[in-house]
């Protein structure tokens, strides 16, 4: 198959922090669907890769569900609901969107959605019945047949809120039943009669909000599982009541729990009884799910097993005892340690041999059943990522991993996991292998100082410098199959790891002696409540990516320095290519606060303050030869600073203002968000909210800016949307033109090539842009090209091919407000 020009090779993300944003397709090889920001992500847990993104919502995706088939085969339809008040029905083909239909009518965010297939009047005819609940206190019902969607009904709950809905077909009939979990502590049952849902009865018993309801059919009976904030799970049995249950006077037993349905002209009495109450969780139970039916040896199996997830950080697998029929806890799994707050949701997968939980901070926890001991479950590797907008990212200097920062107050490191398959073929997948910083402020920017050292800035006045511990370097070398001696070239005294003291924000370095002297568990139990901070770091030798529990506690990097000098929150930071200088800037509404501070990476002292801009500096970048520092600002101008060669080695080089624009000479009419240099130091590129990208130059340190002013040297490129990120590839295309990646506020990424022409017309050439499934769903925050090296690593051997003119495949990473980090590969020969 011929590869396309632009491909998404790796995606890092996690589910939204809401209940119901997770659904696992039934059948072998079923995909896991979850909502990430405004997108629906389809993830393959077996291959550990994201298959595609479904972009259609304009606000957060709150709930979704695969429409299950009767025979247990994988479904190709799913429904999702979001904070944009919409429900979207997705139809897939080969795991790609074939068509999508928007169902509108709700006047508030959709919080729950469910759908089933219902048989039509003709044999073999089916249509989808969809129910959705929203914060407008209504449940809306739709019917979808083919490409036609028909609105059926609205169920009003006045001042109440329905938090969960579930549809099913009454056994032996074609009558749908709808269960609605309400905030009045009751479950309301509705029966469809003459195409309209009518209330049948309400089930009482729970003492707090109903968080989840789900039906399952076992023979002629229908079972309903419900969970609540009262920490309990209730299982209700719904069955057709024979006429023999009637007493002589015609009254019915359990009258309050019976109702009558009419199907095909025949009236039938249906009874509902409480089967059992399950008490095992110690906090709110947020989700409960029956194990889906599946085929085994050609026979459709429906196991009687129930999975529940709770805010007590545990997930329990329940099943009735074979002898007594009493429901018992079979398996309990969960989180241990860390700053976590329990589980939002859970799902069965792979015929019940895998279970997954969705944690409060977005993390997924996957467990797989042992084939040797069925009662033993082991954690598995699963996708991870930020749960809030990703603000910045950087490749390490050798292009072997990326570090990202986010307003979720974490810094994360993603790297390739290189392993051999059963046929001894090399396989590469990317995973989060470290979480160097878990902070108390939103982290806004970072810069790599060295291969294993970076500086980050957050919504505080301090810059923090981190250095990798020995345990990380050792594990990284094993996971990525790199030479440890190449990484630890000298015998420096590296700390083993780091920990955060109680009520602290600084990662404290831990050395071998600190770990050896830590108390035993018994001593920890009797330690004073306000004594010294407990050591939680435990060094571990890993040969595969770590689990979420390990990431939370054992992958912090020690903080080696704090840099004080700014008066407001840090906005951007940059490091020069020789790794000797840092430049940083903070929020500012006055010139004195908008000054750029230069720091020495040798002494960690301020070298110089560069004052020019009157508002916040949004991005800075050093030229590849380190002779210039470029800054762009919210004041719609840029400034170019030239390094002065020091007359003596005792003095650090300093920068002087070389060129700038003002309100008259500035081409941009709105905030300039981004800038970057061409690899030959001649030109620099600026991108602005005014939808323009401009090339400026030429820049020569020997020129006098008065005699050779730096002006626009390109035609103005209008990309049709606000430009939020610009990045220039370090290599040229085969035609020796500059390759420029442009990130837009719409989430799209466009790649252009540019070359200076005498007429400044036709100098821009559009090469390729991301399609809807490849794009981010919200604004791009940063783009960064990978440095090109001879040992380029990726999934395919083709990626390592080098021609005399350069590599065939180029790689760049992107991050955005949609919580997602993506790595793309581009065919250089096609640009």
Curated annotation (Swiss-Prot):
SUPFAM superfamilies named in the record? WD40 repeat-like
The pathway is: tRNA modification; 5-methoxycarbonylmethyl-2-thiouridine-tRNA biosynthesis
Q: Where are the WD repeats?
A: 56-100, 105-152, 158-200, 205-246, 280-328, 338-377, 385-424, 438-476, 565-609, 612-651, 667-706, 718-762, 775-831
Alphabetic keyword roster: Cytoplasm, Nucleus, Repeat, tRNA processing, WD repeat
Pfam families for the chain: WD40 (PF00400)
A molecular function (GO) term: RNA polymerase II complex binding
One annotated Gene Ontology cellular component of this protein: elongator holoenzyme complex
SMART domains, alphabetically? WD40
Similarity comment: family membership:
Belongs to the WD repeat ELP2 family.
Q: What does the record's free text say on domains?
A: Folds into a two seven-bladed beta-propeller structure which is required for elongator complex assembly.
Q: What is the protein's given name?
A: Elongator complex protein 2
């Amino acid at each position: 198959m011929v590869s396309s020009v632009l491909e998404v090779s790796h995606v890092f993300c996690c589910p939204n922090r809401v209940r119901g944003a997770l659904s696992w397709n039934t059948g072998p090889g079923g995909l896991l669907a979850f909502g990430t920001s405004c997108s629906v992500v389809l993830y393959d847990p077996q291959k550990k890769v994201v298959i595609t993104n479904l972009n259609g919502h304009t606000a957060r995706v709150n709930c979704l569900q695969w429409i299950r088939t009767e025979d247990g085969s994988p479904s190709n339809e799913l429904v999702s609901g979001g904070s944009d008040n919409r429900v979207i029905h997705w139809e897939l083909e080969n795991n790609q969107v074939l068509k999508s239909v928007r169902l509108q009518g709700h006047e508030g965010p959709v919080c729950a959605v469910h759908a089933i297939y219902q048989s039509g009047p003709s044999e073999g005819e089916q249509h989808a019945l969809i129910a959705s609940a929203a914060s407008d206190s209504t449940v809306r019902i739709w019917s979808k047949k083919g490409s036609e969607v028909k609105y059926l009904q609205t169920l009003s709950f006045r001042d109440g809120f329905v938090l969960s809905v579930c549809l099913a077909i009454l056994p032996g009939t074609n009558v749908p039943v709808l269960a609605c979990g309400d905030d009045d502590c009751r479950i309301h049952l509705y029966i469809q009669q003459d195409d309209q849902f009518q209330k049948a009865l309400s089930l009482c018993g729970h003492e707090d909000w109903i968080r989840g309801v789900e039906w399952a059919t076992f023979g002629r009976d229908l079972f309903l599982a419900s969970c609540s904030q009262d920490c309990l799970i209730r299982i209700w049995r719904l069955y057709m009541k024979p006429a023999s249950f009637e007493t002589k006077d015609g009254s019915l037993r359990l009258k309050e729990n019976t109702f009558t349905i009419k199907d095909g002209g025949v009236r039938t009495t249906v009874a509902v009884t409480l089967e059992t109450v399950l008490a095992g969780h110690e906090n709110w139970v947020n989700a409960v799910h029956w194990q889906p039916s599946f085929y085994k040896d050609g026979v459709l199996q429906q196991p009687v097993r129930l999975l529940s997830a709770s805010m007590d950080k545990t997930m329990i697998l329940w099943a009735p005892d074979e002898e007594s029929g009493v429901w018992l806890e079979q398996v309990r799994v969960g989180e241990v340690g860390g700053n976590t707050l329990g589980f939002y949701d859970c799902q069965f997968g792979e015929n019940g041999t895998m279970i997954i939980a969705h944690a409060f901070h977005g993390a997924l926890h996957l467990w797989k059943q042992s084939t040797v001991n069925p009662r033993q479950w082991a954690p598995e590797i699963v996708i991870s990522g930020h749960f809030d907008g990703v603000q910045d990212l950087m490749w390490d200097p050798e292009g072997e991993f990326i570090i990202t920062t986010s307003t979720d107050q974490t810094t994360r490191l993603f790297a390739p996991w290189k392993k051999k398959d059963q046929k001894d073929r090399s396989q590469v997948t990317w995973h989060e292998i470290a979480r160097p910083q878990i902070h108390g402020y939103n982290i806004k920017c970072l810069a790599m100082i060295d291969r294993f050292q970076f500086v980050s800035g957050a919504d505080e006045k301090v810059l923090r410098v981190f250095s990798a511990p020995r345990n990380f370097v050792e594990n990284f070398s094993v996971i990525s199959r790199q030479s440890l001696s190449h990484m630890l070239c000298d015998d420096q005294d590296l700390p083993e790891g780091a920990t955060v003291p109680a009520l602290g924000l600084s990662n404290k370095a831990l050395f071998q002696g600190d770990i050896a002297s830590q108390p035993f568990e018994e001593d920890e139990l009797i330690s004073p409540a306000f004594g010294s901070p407990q050591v939680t770091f435990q060094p571990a030798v890993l040969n595969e990516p770590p689990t979420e529990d390990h990431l939370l506690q054992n992958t912090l990097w020690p903080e080696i320095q704090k840099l004080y000098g700014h008066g407001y929150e840090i906005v951007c930071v940059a490091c020069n290519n020789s790794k000797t200088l840092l430049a940083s800037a903070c929020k500012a509404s006055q010139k004195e606060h908008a000054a750029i501070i230069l720091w020495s990476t040798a002494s960690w002292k301020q070298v110089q303050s560069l004052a020019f801009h009157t508002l916040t500096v949004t991005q800075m970048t050093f030229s590849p030869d380190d002779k210039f520092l470029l800054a762009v600002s919210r004041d719609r101008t840029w400034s170019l600073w030239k390094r002065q060669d020091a007359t003596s080695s005792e003095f650090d080089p300093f920068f002087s203002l070389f060129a700038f624009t003002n309100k008259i000479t500035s081409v941009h009419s709105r905030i300039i968000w981004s800038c970057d240099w061409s690899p030959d130091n001649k030109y620099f590129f600026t991108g602005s909210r005014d939808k323009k990208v401009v090339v400026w130059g030429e820049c020569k340190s020997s020129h006098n800016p008065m005699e050779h002013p730096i002006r626009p040297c390109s035609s103005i490129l209008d990309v049709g949307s606000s430009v939020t990120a610009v990045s220039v590839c370090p290599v040229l295309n085969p035609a020796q033109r500059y390759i420029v990646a442009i990130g837009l506020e719409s989430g799209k990424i466009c790649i252009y090539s540019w070359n200076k022409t005498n007429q400044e017309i036709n100098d821009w050439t559009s090469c390729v842009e991301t399609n809807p499934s490849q794009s981010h769903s919200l604004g791009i925050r940063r783009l960064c090209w990978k440095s090109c090296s001879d040992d380029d690593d990726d999934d395919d051997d083709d990626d390592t091919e080098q021609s005399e003119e350069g590599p065939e495949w180029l790689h760049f990473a992107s991050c955005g407000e949609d919580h997602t980090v993506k790595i793309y590969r581009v065919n250089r020969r096609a640009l």
